[in-house]
């Protein structure tokens, strides 16, 4: 199961990287937005948020603050005016939340309300629980995705590299 999830992670990282190369943020990465194609490759679905923002060079922080699913939102999505603007690294946080859920079967902050998640993620700086026995390189890169300063998170190209090994 770990190898399959790593393969899906690489597929998804490639998809996100392709969108980033086109100047598009995803901002709502979560397992229910992932699909499997006829060749058992994971692909991204649901482009509602990127479509909404397509063509806007600097999205309004008030709009961004309301976009995303709380269990997968990076700190700057909750408070863009305080924590910095959204960036490609914002997608790194959502990607890592999604992959941890795929490895463990447990949604990050499951059972918590949006207000509780805000308290845990933004104010207490809590990070999701990691399952045991992840490959070291994958665990290291995912851990880096949860840095609170988005500038310290890995880029999707770094994530892809870790998942391709």
Q: Where are these predicted regions, by residue range?
A:
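Activation segment signature within eukaryotic-like protein kinase domains
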Residues: 8-9
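Catalytic-loop of the protein kinase fold
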Residues: 20-36
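Conserved catalytic-loop aspartate of Hanks-type protein kinases
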Residues: 91
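Activation segment/activation loop of eukaryotic-type protein kinase catalytic domains
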Residues: 37-70
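Structural helix C-cap motif within protein kinase domains
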Residues: 104-108
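Conserved C-terminal C-lobe helix
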Residues: 133-146
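A conserved short helix/loop substructure at the end of the activation segment
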Residues: 146-158
């Amino acid at each position: 199961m770990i190898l399959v999830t790593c393969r899906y992670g690489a597929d998804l990282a490639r998809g996100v990287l392709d969108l980033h190369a086109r100047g598009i943020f995803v901002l709502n990465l979560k397992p229910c937005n992932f699909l499997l194609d006829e060749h058992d490759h994971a692909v991204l679905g649901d482009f509602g948020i990127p479509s909404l923002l397509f063509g806007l060079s600097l999205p309004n922080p008030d709009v961004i603050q309301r976009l995303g699913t709380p269990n997968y939102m990076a700190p700057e999505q909750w408070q863009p005016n305080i924590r910095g603007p959204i960036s490609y690294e914002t997608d790194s946080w959502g990607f890592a939340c999604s992959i941890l859920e795929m490895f463990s079967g447990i949604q990050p902050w499951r059972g918590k309300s949006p207000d509780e998640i805000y308290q845990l993620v933004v104010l207490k700086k809590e990070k999701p629980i990691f399952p045991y026995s992840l490959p070291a390189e994958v665990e290291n890169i995912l851990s880096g995705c949860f840095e609170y300063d988005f500038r310290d998170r890995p880029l999707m190209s770094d994530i892809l590299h870790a998942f391709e090994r």
